[in-house]
């Protein structure tokens, strides 16, 4: 990669931060430095929506195997922890995060997409967890999120076989939210909604507190939003 080009590119529109994995010659494989830059890009914005995409014909090949090949055990653990921090940053971001997946998503690329709020694929997208073929597995939170998203049976099938699934199969198993020619349009669709409400919905959906605590928080936030939008609600009622 040329020294003057970052592996992560940021472009801020009015309501959407576009974060591009920008290493197309390596199918956007991620080094430790790129992971750190990605974490900062996703966390360091007040835009209500973050759109995560890959440059070139792939979404993301996951971890850079040139890096992994040189790691000893402790360094490999640190690299896995780094990837987990990035996935957690995506999941915990105040912004709604949309992963636009065009072309192959492999290994860590799938794991980062799993942390997004919406995974939107083009018809050309494909997905695989091929680590098992190298004697590895997805350690950027994949063993936690994959069964949560698609169910234990589908998750075990993908992770134990390393097989590749196309966009339609990914949609059927719930791995992606939609299949469309223009995933960016979905990010823009979300950004048309009220920013505070987007943050509130994400926070409530991601809340893992006991049910009674979640319900109390839900009512408190709902009350605040009703007060804030009272005029708009009245106008809609009277129209």
Task: Name what the model sees in each region.
Residues 52, 65, 76, 83, ...:
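A general structural signal for well-ordered alpha-helical segments in protein cores
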């Amino acid at each position: 990669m040329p020294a003057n080009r970052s592996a992560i590119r940021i472009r801020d529109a009015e309501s959407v931060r576009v974060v591009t994995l920008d290493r197309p010659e390596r199918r956007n494989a991620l080094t430790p430095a790129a992971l750190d830059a990605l974490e900062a890009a996703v966390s360091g914005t007040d835009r209500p929506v973050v759109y995560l995409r890959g440059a070139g014909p792939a979404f993301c090949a996951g971890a850079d195997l040139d890096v992994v090949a040189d790691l000893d055990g402790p360094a490999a653990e640190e690299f896995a922890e780094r990837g987990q921090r990035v996935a957690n940053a995506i999941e915990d971001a105040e912004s709604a995060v949309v992963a636009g997946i065009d072309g192959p998503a492999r290994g860590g690329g799938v794991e980062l997409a799993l942390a997004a709020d919406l995974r939107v694929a083009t018809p050309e997208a494909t997905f695989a967890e091929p680590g098992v073929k190298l004697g590895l597995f997805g350690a950027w939170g994949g063993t936690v999120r994959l069964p949560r998203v698609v169910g234990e049976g589908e998750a075990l099938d993908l992770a134990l076989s390393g097989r590749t699934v196309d966009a339609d199969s990914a949609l059927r198993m719930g791995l992606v939210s939609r299949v469309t020619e223009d995933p960016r349009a979905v990010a823009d669709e979300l950004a048309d909604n009220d920013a505070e409400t987007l943050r509130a919905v994400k926070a409530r959906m991601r809340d893992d507190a006991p049910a009674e605590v979640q319900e109390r928080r839900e009512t408190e936030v709902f009350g605040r939003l009703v007060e804030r939008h009272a005029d708009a609600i009245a106008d809609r009622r009277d129209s």
